[in-house]
Amino acid sequence: MKAVETRILELRAELDEHNYRYHVLDEPSIPDVEYDRLFHELKALEAENPHLVTPDSPTQRVGSAALSAFTQVRHEMPMLSLGNAFEENDMLEFDRRVTEGLDLPAGDLFGAGSKVQYSCEPKLDGLAVSLLYRDGALVRGATRGDGTTGEDISVNVRTVRNIPLKLKGKGWPDVLEVRGEVFMSKAGFERLNASQLEIGGKTFANPRNAAAGSLRQLDSKITANRPLEFCCYGLGQTSAEIADTHIGVLETLKKWGMPVSHELKLANGVEECLDYYRDIGERRLTLSYEIDGVVFKVNNLAAQRELGFRAREPRWAIAHKFPAMEELTELLDVEFQVGRTGAVTPVARLKPVKVAGVMVANATLHNMDEVARLGLMIGDTVIIRRAGDVIPQVVQVVAERRPENARAVQVPQTCPVCGSHVERTQLIKRSKGKETVTEGAVYRCVGRLACGAQLKQAIIHYVSRRAMDIEGLGDKTIEQLVDEKLIGSPADLYKLKYEQIIDLEGFAEISSNKLLKAIADSRQPTLARFIYALGIPDVGEETAKVLARSLASLDRVKQALPEVLTYLPDVGLEVAYEIHSFFEDEHNRNVIDALLGECGLQLQDQGELGAEFAASTTLEGLIDKLHIPSVGPGAAQKLADRFGTLEAIISADWLDMRQTLPEKQAKSVRDFFDDSAHAERARAIEAQLKDFGMHWRSEKKTVEGLPLAGQTWVLTGSLERMSRDVAKEKLESLGAKVSGSVSAKTHTVVAGPGAGSKLTKANELGLTVLDEDALLKRLTELGVAVD
């Protein structure tokens, strides 16, 4: 028994240390799989020895029985709110009051010169909580409530992964109350809403609501499954002082295992506070969590005590708020716009309101499912949210303010642009050889390029920088060309005459000739650029590159069956069907034929089948992709090893099949191929793969055909002989992965003039660094043209 108890204590200590390194220091020392192994070992030992389970064990974060209600908790030291600053003048006034309150006339010394030192940290947009530790163990968690009385949420805070159940180290007071914010990261919020949608559950308007709703669950098992995090920002009651400054307090708490903001900083005077505010304001949208301002506190704790409090807020702290990202306004109407693929999308027309410093009159509604989820009606009062460059969106309806004359939102039966019929899309779910059809969220105009809106967006996409890269064709010019009926498809761009262009608004002789040259220069695109330019639904730039690299010819891409396309990396069955359907469409084929025929486009980089694709096409892979009920990858491998060919599997007798697989799986295979449609489909897939030059091998091969396969390259600084996009394409054609960040896994860094921190890090890690000349030489050696 002693050995078991010792092992349990060892595991707890080790897991606590790893939790500390992961959540507080952000320096994980072991992979997740090893952490999971240790965790499950501890969990198993505690299950066998329940009398050894303690409340501070890492296993005790999974939640307990649901409560009927939260009990009330009185805060020994009130959790007060902070005063707010909205303008720089408010901060200057705050600093003046602090200086006068400390009786510090100009020229007197305090810390550094006559300036007051302030701690600076982001104001997290979450839920304030109090954590009470006795003898280093967490004994209670409570919400802020009204500042005097909160709710006991102890069982819930114990499930938050980065809240220590027992403090690290030693020297902590007998009684220690830590205060901070429970919040949800942006990524965690997106994951939560996605999972809620999948199960038909409630979604949340923003991360703050999600954090608050998750933390105040009566069933702590629900809280345990929510991606909550904690960041401490100060102390409540303590039985002993732990530092002389606020930053000293936080640094000490960090040593004891408490997560502290990575953005914590000391400012020497109010001007440095304003610099901090501006800096973090510029970086606000790049942070992994949402903040609604910055909190400044007098750093010296003795000075804090001297300044004291007024009403319900401290005189020594202030929250400098950012402009609001959410506002209330009225929904005046819902109009519908038509996109490149014909999607008819609702757009909210709003009573203009200022959100995050910008006047907003329109907001996206995504689709009619979103309108239904919100319960939105014209005339409603709604909450609008805007974050940086993100299009403003309606996140919530204030139902209690709905007027009596509110109207339902109706989808138009005909396209608002061209008058064509509008139909609701269908979603086809394919699994285990069966198809399930459900209504989609998107409504679509069937007018295709006869619809002016679709034509304009299709041309804008076709000429864009990452597609055909035709300079001089801006959105307004394309609108003119379409409105004047000078173009009716991408192919018509190549038929434009000088006389037609010079008559357009904004064009003269030089600009007209430059545009004609840019159009002519686009006649030799790479296969990847051309595929992307076609605007195939769900096919972005990276998928287009995969198609080009793997199949290496437009004919193969056009002919490829959906199941064949799923052999490609990151191409799932639904996307494969979108690609296949696009090339099956007669209208799309006519446009492509015109581009490659009368327009004279010549696609580059076509040739032999890609080595990566060739290595992935195995017989067991084909069997697995047929989605035979009860037959997974393991059974598929057994069939491939036993029979060697598809025809042998189809024609195998019962005895052979039964010797290979258990009865249930054997029967499933026989039943599947007894359906002639299934057998013929499998033969068609195999025939196409063989037409592409494949032959079966029972084992998956390592890709060796591409000289830079498995290598990660990074481009930094500027290049003179070619753009970074072109350099990236050429490296990727050789099998390299081109990343935006340098790490120990990086193989080579290409550094041009202006290279900064990435080059510094590469040198620190001892990585191979090439200049542009060395890159061009390397590409030439590998047979890639660089001119």
UniProtKB/Swiss-Prot annotation:
InterPro entries in alphabetical order: BRCT_dom (IPR001357), BRCT_dom_sf (IPR036420), DisA/LigA_HHH (IPR041663), DNA_ligase (IPR001679), DNA_ligase_AS (IPR018239), DNA_ligase_CS (IPR033136), DNAligase_adenylation (IPR013839), DNAligase_N (IPR013840)
* Positions annotated to bind NAD(+): D32, V33, E34, Y35, D36, S81, L82, E121, R144, E181, K297, K321
Could you say which enzyme class this protein belongs to? ligase
- Which cofactor(s) are needed, names only? Mg(2+); Mn(2+)
Which Enzyme Commission number(s) are listed? 6.5.1.2
Q: Where does Zn(2+) bind?
A: C415, C418, C445, C451
Question: Which transformation does this protein catalyse, written as a reaction?
Answer: NAD(+) + (deoxyribonucleotide)n-3'-hydroxyl + 5'-phospho-(deoxyribonucleotide)m = (deoxyribonucleotide)n+m + AMP + beta-nicotinamide D-nucleotide
What residues does the BRCT domain cover?
A: 703-787
Gene Ontology cellular-component terms listed:
cytosol
| Biological process per Gene Ontology, one example term | DNA repair
UniProtKB keywords? DNA damage, DNA repair, DNA replication, Ligase, Magnesium, Manganese, Metal-binding, NAD, Zinc
Per its record, what are the GO molecular function terms? DNA binding; DNA ligase (NAD+) activity; metal ion binding
Q: Where is the active site?
A: K123
**Described purpose of this protein according to its UniProt entry:** DNA ligase that catalyzes the formation of phosphodiester linkages between 5'-phosphoryl and 3'-hydroxyl groups in double-stranded DNA using NAD as a coenzyme and as the energy source for the reaction. It is essential for DNA replication and repair of damaged DNA.
- Similarity comment: Belongs to the NAD-dependent DNA ligase family. LigA subfamily.
Name of the protein in question: DNA ligase
Source organism: Pseudomonas savastanoi pv. phaseolicola (strain 1448A / Race 6)
